[in-house]
Amino acid sequence: MNSKKYILIILLTINFSCNMSQKNNDGVIYASIETNKGIIKTELFFNQTPVTVANFISLAEGNNKEVSDQYKGKKYYNGLTFHRVIPDFMIQGGDPTGTGSGSPGYNFKDEFVNELKHDSPGTLSMANAGPGTNGSQFFITHKETPWLDGGHTVFGKVLEGQDVVDKIEQGDSIVNVEIIRDGSGAKRFNAAKVFTNHFKEEEKLKKDAEKKLLKLKEDVSKIHNKLKSEANETETGLKYFINEKGDGDKVDESKVILTHYAVYFEDGNLLDTSILKVAEKYDMFDNRRAQGGGYSPIEAKVGPKDMMIQGFKEGLKILNIGDKATLFLPYYLAYGETESRGIPAKSNLIFEVEIVDQK
């Protein structure tokens, strides 16, 4: 055998062995969920979703330091019920009130991992009321539920006892949750510490993000002020600036206009956008919106009877396909003198738009 090939094979073998060894050293963490119908044995993905698993384990073992005082030092899940059961969908538990609205006294972040999907029966996942609202409630699926991907954190899977999952009825109880650690990495995983540290890290990230956002808003506001000083003005008081001229036909008010937009307050604060990069820059990315195709051009109708804000319609009708423009709407061409949809009364708005097409 050629010596170079031999060396390459040896190196690949060593590398593969090291990877396998590292994986074995990480170990596995199991949760044995004893119910009144039998035992459900699950694996917890502590490497991929460490915060979510740390939350579950520390609640189960009674050493979670973030819970409300009434739950401290108690094995949180013991004695709770499966308060929500939907046949051929899932079983849900972990609510101390049994109503679906209870919590341990805090919320924490989502941990979405591309490789972890709701792609089979026995998926263990977090229930929530929207982004960043995880608490103690979890569910286990009866079947694959792909529409939940990107909205709920998958943090484990059923290894044994799927038949028990399928027998659970509303009101059935969790008798005990036992956490089993197998392997050195699993035994080193300090759930209570990991979970508490997560809040400290999140607080630091939040402060850093606030500083970054403040600078971004100031920069955007300066740009808008400069453009406004150079903008054209219509008889109604709308001002517009063409950032980039397209070469398409003029917008036809009888057609549906496909347009990207980002709408801002005058201080540079972003209200809403269809543009993914802008949402990410402002830390306003919504995974559920992305899953539903929400970062795509909207369909706008700009005829006289169409229900869109007046200044937005007027601004689009000035433009051609391919144009990128900034529209400055005085409050009376936007949402008017009263508060609307969380927008303060008499708010002047700024739209950045791109006319993509019309049909």
Question: Whereabouts are the PLM-identified features?
Answer:
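Bacterial Sec-dependent N-terminal signal peptides
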Residues: M1-V28
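Cross-family detector of peptidyl-prolyl cis-trans isomerase
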Residues: C18-K359
